[in-house]
Amino acid sequence: MDEEAAIDRLPLDLLAYIFSLATSFTVLAQASGVCKKWRKAVNQSMARRETLSFAGWKMDDDSTSRLVHLAFNLKELDISRSRWGCHITDNGLYQIASARCVSNLNSVSLWGMTAITDSGVVQLISRTSSLQHLNIGGTFITDESLFAIAERCHQLKTIGMWCCRHVTERGLLVLVNKCRKLESINLWGTRVPVDCFIALLTISPALQIKPMELLLNAQNPPPLLHAV
């Protein structure tokens, strides 16, 4: 009883700090169920977070959205699919898009989220005016998402589109033309022709096209490639 009383006497700010050190969402969920004070402390700890990663966790639309909505000061959000059974859909992106933190996000990773479409991505991107780093590799997005990114994300510096096989030269040209701060783009596994890379470099000569082989193909004729 004395130990419980001592815990109960801990200031709310101290409890929130302790919970901010927790790396397990399961632990935070259990702590929220202890009492109203602990629930408030957990919520306060989430509000302080600037980074949030669900790597290794089995998440769904509701649980992901709930945590993002609590993280008022969030700057970096990683909801990549890193575990079998992790299922986040367009509905989850719709919910996340209404979170207070979204307009301040500078980094978002949706890598491998095969259940999302252009609809969800466009909805989320419509709120991200501060985005600098975006990873949408391993998804089935099309040029529709690229057009939305080009219109909204003028601060964008890096974008990953690994194996995004449905994007075309048209979408990439619009993206690079409008995102003038873009420094790096990963196009491994896409189906765009070498001529597209040449066009991208014409628009932005300093652009880093990854992997390096793509850049070499764009800059050198085939005979020189064999000599390298």
From Swiss-Prot:
- Signal peptide location in the record? none
**In this protein, which residues make up the domain named F-box?**
4-51
Q: Which domain of life is it from?
A: Eukaryota
Stored InterPro entries: F-box-like_dom_sf, F-box_dom, Leu-rich_rpt, Leu-rich_rpt_Cys-con_subtyp, LRR_dom_sf
One of its Pfam families is: LRR_6
UniProt-listed Gene3D superfamilies: 1.20.1280.50, Ribonuclease Inhibitor
> What's the protein here called?
F-box protein At5g67140
Originating species: Arabidopsis thaliana
